[in-house]
Amino acid sequence: MKGGKAIASGSYGCVFKPALLCEGDTERKKDYITKVMYHSYADLELKEMKMVGDVLKEIPDGDKYFLVNNITRCRFSELDGDDVKGRKNKCSGAFDKSLTDREFNLKINKGLITGINIPYGGKDLLDTIGPNLTSKTFININKGIINLIKNGIVKFNKKKLLHLDIKHMNMLYNPKDKNVRLIDWGICAKYTNDVVTEGVKDRNLM
């Protein structure tokens, strides 16, 4: 088994946990996930991470509030029988359901599909908050969100950076350190001279 199983999907990528085995590595990275996506989207995401990282590195203890560091390209070989379990259902948001395992692997071999390794930050708040949520975890999540807003979001907003897609699915809770971290900067934007473009005025301006 080269990696993990598909666990979630967004519009542009499908998440595998544990991480897939990247070319040149003898073992998969521990405490990482692999976001599998089309090559062009991976290029764009890495470029965005570089831009965002340059801003967020100036924020004290930024690693407590964001997942933008230690993100690397992961070129992997064909998915095997274990890797592909649940791929069609879990990855339907990023890849067409009609794409067979053979066609999927063919796109990998052609370099059309690649991956990005990202540190595992926990489950998103949509999956975390439910009927089995304990009062202790609820309190920890609330504290984590308050710290994220006060020490993270407010500070990068002051640096004229807007995330524009802050919601429960883009916030991860890690029970180990009790932090809530913001992810998915795909539609973020920087602005100048206190002017926000018309295209983003209908979004959450944070």
Question: Where does each model-flagged region fall?
Answer:
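C-lobe/activation-segment region of protein kinase-like
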Residues: 179-206
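Conserved hydrophobic alpha-helix
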Residues: 152-156
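Catalytic-loop of the protein kinase fold
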Residues: 157-174
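ATP-binding glycine-rich loop module of kinase domains
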Residues: 11-94
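Conserved structural core of kinase catalytic domains
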Residues: 62-141
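Conserved N-terminal boundary motif of the eukaryotic protein kinase catalytic domain
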Residues: 1-6
